[in-house]
Curated annotation (Swiss-Prot):
IMPDH1 is the main species in normal leukocytes and IMPDH2 predominates over IMPDH1 in the tumor. Its EC number is 1.1.1.205. The gene is IMPDH2. Catalyzes the conversion of inosine 5'-phosphate (IMP) to xanthosine 5'-phosphate (XMP), the first committed and rate-limiting step in the de novo synthesis of guanine nucleotides, and therefore plays an important role in the regulation of cell growth. Could also have a single-stranded nucleic acid-binding activity and could play a role in RNA and/or DNA metabolism. It may also have a role in the development of malignancy and the growth progression of some tumors. K(+) binds at G326, G328, C331, E500, G501, G502. Induction: Selectively up-regulated in neoplastic and replicating cells. The lineage of its organism: Eukaryota, Metazoa, Chordata, Craniata, Vertebrata. Pathway: Purine metabolism; XMP biosynthesis via de novo pathway; XMP from IMP: step 1/1. It is an enzyme of class 1 (oxidoreductase). This is Inosine-5'-monophosphate dehydrogenase 2. The active site is at C331, R429. Changing L263F: Results in 10-fold decrease of enzymatic activity. Residues 114-173, 179-237 form the CBS domain. It is found in: Cytoplasm; Nucleus; Cytoplasm, Cytosol.
Length: 514
C-alpha cells in the first residue's frame, strides 16, 4: 500500500526522456535507428496535420519530400510525379547539359496556366507535321496561325479529332483543308484572368482555349488537361506561372557554367550544387557566381555534416543546405575515406546552426522507411531527400528485370565506378576527374519494384501525418518548435530495444506497408 501513498498529487508528472540537445551532446554519433521520439497528447486527426515545408528561403512545398539527383532515380518522369504529389525532383547531371535541360523543359511544360509559347503551325503545314509534333511533345492540340508563329492571326486549330482517322496517303494534306476553322472556335480575350479562362474552357467542353487580342492575334492558350491535373493533384508544387517546380543538379567546375545557362533557359527553379564534400573553394565560388548572374535562382549547397562546413556556404549565400556524407545505402565514403558523420547527428547539428540564419536543411541519405523521414524532420530538417526509397518505382529511370522471380530495377551510387564511367559529372562530384586511379565511393545494386510514385508517396505522406499525430503536433513547424524548446523528448535505443521494436517471435510473416 505504501507504494501508492507517495505525495505529489495527481498533477505530479516525473521528468522523462531526453531533449534533442541532451541526446546529441553526448559525443556519440547517432543515426535514425539509435533513438525514438516519445509520444505526446492527441486532440486532432492525422489528416489535419499540415506538412507544408520550406525547401529553400523562397520555395515552399506542401509535402517535405525530395527525390535525389541520381541517374537511377530522377529524370523528367520522377520529377513530374514528385511535383504533382507536393514535393520536388532534382534532375541528375550525369548526362550532357542538353539532355538535362530538355528533361527540365519536359517538367515545366507538363502543366501550365497560360501557355505563352505553345507549338504553333501554319495553314500550309501538312498533317505529317502534326504527327511529328505529337511524337516530340506528346500532344496534338495545336493552334494554327497565318504565319505559323505566336503573335500572328489565329485561323484555326488542329486536334486529335481532326486527324485520328486519316489514312496514310492523306498525311500530305495541308492543314487548312482539315483544321477546325476560326469561326468554329471558342476563344477568350487577352487580359482575362486564369480563373475566368478556366471557367470558359469548362463550359465550352473543348480541349484548348486560345487567348487572342483585339486584332485576333494569338497571345496564349490554356488546356483542359491542365484543369484535370489541378483537380486530381491539389498538392502539386507550382511556380507563379502555374508550372510544376523542378530542380536540377550541377557541379562546381567551369564547364558547369554552360550547363547552368541551359538550365536557366529551360526554366529551372532551383539548382543543387552536387558534391560529396561541399565545403570547398570551388563550391563557394560557384555559389557567388550563380547569385551574381541569376539572383532569383535558388541555390542549394552541400553536402555538409558540420556547422563549420555550413558556415562557409551560408556566408557565400546559399538558400538551403543539403546534409549527409556517407549515409546512403549505396555510399561507401565513410568506409573508404574515413570521413563523414552518422546522419541523425549531422542533421541535428547543421539544422540547429542553420536555423539562426533562416536557411532550411535537406536531410539527404540514410532514409530506409517512413519512420526515418519523421525522425529527420523532428531533428530540424525541413525536407528529406530520398534515393533508394524511390528507386525501382515506375517513374524511376531504367528498365525492370527479373532475378529469382523478383522484379527489380538497377540502383547505383553516383560515386560507383559504373556511374563514373558513364559521365565526367559523377567524377567531378567526388573530385576524381583528374585521378589516374578512381576510388569508388559508391556501389551498384538492384532494388525491388515499389510500384508507382502516385501510390507510394501518398503512403509516405500519411505515415508522416500519423507520426506527427502521435507526437502531438499539428504541423511540422510545431514539431520543430517543440524540439528546440525541449518539449519534444527522445530516448536512446539499445540493440535489444531495436530488435523489440521490429518484427520478432514469428515463424513467418508478410510485411505489406501499403
Amino acid at each position: 500500500m505504501a507504494d501508492y501513498l507517495i505525495s505529489g498529487g495527481t498533477s505530479y508528472v516525473p521528468d522523462d526522456g531526453l531533449t534533442a540537445q541532451q541526446l546529441f551532446n553526448c559525443g556519440d554519433g547517432l543515426t535514425y535507428n539509435d533513438f525514438l521520439i516519445l509520444p505526446g497528447y492527441i486532440d486532432f486527426t492525422a489528416d489535419q496535420v499540415d506538412l507544408t515545408s520550406a525547401l529553400t528561403k523562397k520555395i515552399t512545398l506542401k509535402t517535405p519530400l525530395v527525390s535525389s539527383p541520381m541517374d537511377t532515380v530522377t529524370e523528367a518522369g520522377m520529377a513530374i510525379a514528385m511535383a504533382l504529389t507536393g514535393g520536388i525532383g532534382f534532375i541528375h547531371h550525369n548526362c550532357t547539359p542538353e539532355f538535362q535541360a530538355n528533361e527540365v523543359r519536359k517538367v515545366k511544360k507538363y502543366e501550365q496556366g497560360f501557355i505563352t509559347d505553345p507549338v504553333v503551325l501554319s495553314p500550309k503545314d501538312r498533317v505529317r507535321d502534326v504527327f511529328e509534333a505529337k511524337a516530340r511533345h506528346g500532344f496534338c492540340g495545336i493552334p494554327i496561325t497565318d504565319t505559323g508563329r505566336m503573335g500572328s492571326r489565329l485561323v484555326g486549330i488542329i486536334s486529335s479529332r481532326d486527324i485520328d482517322f486519316l489514312k496514310e496517303e492523306e498525311h500530305d494534306c495541308f492543314l487548312e483543308e482539315i483544321m477546325t476553322k476560326r469561326e468554329d472556335l471558342v476563344v477568350a480575350p487577352a487580359g482575362i484572368t486564369l480563373k475566368e479562362a478556366n471557367e470558359i474552357l469548362q463550359r465550352s467542353k473543348k480541349g484548348k482555349l486560345p487567348i487572342v487580342n483585339e486584332d485576333d492575334e494569338l497571345v496564349a492558350i490554356i488546356a483542359r488537361t491542365d484543369l484535370k491535373k489541378n483537380r486530381d493533384y491539389p498538392l502539386a508544387s507550382k511556380d507563379a506561372k502555374k508550372q510544376l517546380l523542378c530542380g536540377a543538379a550541377i557541379g562546381t567546375h567551369e564547364d558547369d557554367k554552360y550547363r547552368l545557362d541551359l538550365l536557366a533557359q529551360a526554366g529551372v527553379d532551383v539548382v543543387v550544387l552536387d558534391s560529396s564534400q561541399g565545403n570547398s573553394i570551388f563550391q563557394i565560388n560557384m555559389i557567388k557566381y550563380i547569385k551574381d548572374k541569376y539572383p532569383n535562382l535558388q541555390v542549394i549547397g552541400g553536402n555538409v555534416v558540420t556547422a563549420a562546413q555550413a558556415k562557409n556556404l551560408i556566408d557565400a549565400g546559399v538558400d538551403a543546405l543539403r546534409v549527409g556524407m556517407g549515409s546512403g545505402s549505396i555510399c561507401i565514403t565513410q568506409e573508404v575515406l574515413a570521413c563523414g558523420r552518422p546522419q541523425a547527428t549531422a542533421v541535428y547539428k547543421v539544422s540547429e546552426y542553420a536555423r539562426r540564419f533562416g536557411v532550411p536543411v535537406i536531410a539527404d541519405g540514410g532514409i530506409q522507411n517512413v519512420g526515418h523521414i519523421a525522425k529527420a524532420l523532428a531533428l530540424g530538417a525541413s525536407t528529406v531527400m530520398m534515393g533508394s526509397l524511390l528507386a525501382a518505382t515506375t517513374e524511376a529511370p531504367g528498365e525492370y528485370f527479373f532475378s529469382d522471380g523478383i522484379r527489380l530495377k538497377k540502383y547505383r551510387g553516383m560515386g560507383s565506378l559504373d556511374a563514373m564511367d558513364k559521365h565526367l559529372s559523377s567524377q567531378n562530384r567526388y573530385f576524381s576527374e583528374a585521378d589516374k586511379i578512381k576510388v569508388a565511393q559508391g556501389v551498384s545494386g538492384a532494388v525491388q519494384d515499389k510500384g508507382s510514385i502516385h501510390k507510394f508517396v501518398p503512403y509516405l505522406i500519411a505515415g508522416i501525418q500519423h507520426s506527427c499525430q502521435d507526437i502531438g503536433a499539428k504541423s511540422l513547424t510545431q514539431v520543430r518548435a517543440m524540439m528546440y524548446s525541449g518539449e519534444l523528448k527522445f530516448e536512446k535505443r539499445t540493440s535489444s530495444a531495436q530488435v523489440e521494436g521490429g518484427v520478432h517471435s514469428l515463424h513467418s510473416y508478410e510485411k505489406r506497408l501499403f
